[in-house]
């Protein structure tokens, strides 16, 4: 199957897979950018030999100069111009491929970074909640300590009073502190 393209040149594409071959011999599909494949074009050279587009692009300057011997100045200019055009197409194609590849890589990195930012934001939010809970407990303990420090010392009465001794500010049972902290935290929730 042959498909027309720019410059009235033909593009050879295999019928089933839609695959083609670029000027440098790389295969491509309609989904991946590559240089526009060119119809094989032959230029007469020294002793009636001819060059394909691929040969013209891939040969060294020394080989090209040997091939150009015996051609008219106009033919030399035309052949060199065609070589330059073909090379530029190849450079443009590889640049397009590189740009698409870089874009895909950057989009992948962006998605990874967005996931990381979301994860860090979630961790930050949970740490803020934990910090608020700890702050509430701290404030409750401070308030309780102030209350105990301000309350007057009352003499102990009753049958167990002799064994307990007087109440001293600052000495409070641990269970009452925990109860106060829990009740303050539960009230705020």
Swiss-Prot record:
Covalent cross-link site, Glycyl lysine isopeptide (Lys-Gly) (interchain with G-Cter in SUMO): 41
Glycyl lysine isopeptide (Lys-Gly) (interchain with G-Cter in SUMO2) crosslink, residue number(s): 41
Keyword Acetylation in annotation: yes
Keyword Ubl conjugation attributed: yes
Keywords: Acetylation, DNA-binding, Isopeptide bond, Nucleus, Phosphoprotein, Repressor, Transcription, Transcription regulation, Ubl conjugation
Residue numbers carrying N6-acetyllysine: 80, 87, 98, 103
Post-translational modification: Acetylated in erythroid cells by CREB-binding protein (CBP). Acetylation augments the DNA-binding activity of NFE2, but has no effect on binding NFE2.
Region forming the signal peptide: none
Family listed: Belongs to the bZIP family. Maf subfamily.
Record-level GO cellular component terms: nucleus; RNA polymerase II transcription regulator complex
GO molecular-function terms, A-Z: DNA binding; DNA-binding transcription activator activity, RNA polymerase II-specific; DNA-binding transcription factor activity, RNA polymerase II-specific; identical protein binding; RNA polymerase II cis-regulatory region sequence-specific DNA binding; sequence-specific double-stranded DNA binding
Tissue: High expression in the ventral medulla surface (VMS), heart and skeletal muscle. Lower expression in the cerebral cortex, cerebellum, liver, stomach and intestine.
Phosphoserine found at: 151
Organism of provenance: Rattus norvegicus
Compartment list: Nucleus
Protein name per Swiss-Prot or TrEMBL: Transcription factor MafG
SUPFAM superfamilies: A DNA-binding domain in eukaryotic transcription factors, Leucine zipper domain
């Amino acid at each position: 199957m042959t498909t027309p393209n720019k410059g009235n040149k033909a593009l050879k594409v295999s019928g089933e897979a839609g695959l083609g071959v670029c000027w440098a011999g790389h295969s491509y599909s309609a989904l991946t950018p590559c240089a526009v494949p060119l119809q094989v074009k032959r230029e007469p050279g020294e002793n009636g030999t001819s060059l394909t587009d691929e040969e013209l692009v891939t040969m060294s300057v020394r080989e090209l100069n040997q091939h150009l011997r015996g051609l008219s100045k106009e033919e030399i200019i035309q052949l060199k111009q065609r070589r330059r055009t073909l090379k530029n197409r190849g450079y443009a194609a590889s640049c397009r491929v590189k740009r698409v590849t870089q874009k895909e890589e950057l989009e992948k990195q962006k998605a990874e970074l967005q996931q990381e930012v979301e994860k860090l934001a979630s961790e930050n939010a949970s740490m803020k909640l934990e910090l608020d809970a700890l702050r509430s407990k701290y404030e409750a303990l401070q308030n309780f300590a102030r209350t105990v420090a301000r309350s007057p010392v009352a003499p102990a009465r009753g049958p167990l009073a002799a064994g307990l001794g007087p109440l001293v500010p600052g000495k409070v049972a641990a269970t009452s502190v925990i109860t106060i902290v829990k009740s303050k935290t539960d009230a705020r929730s």
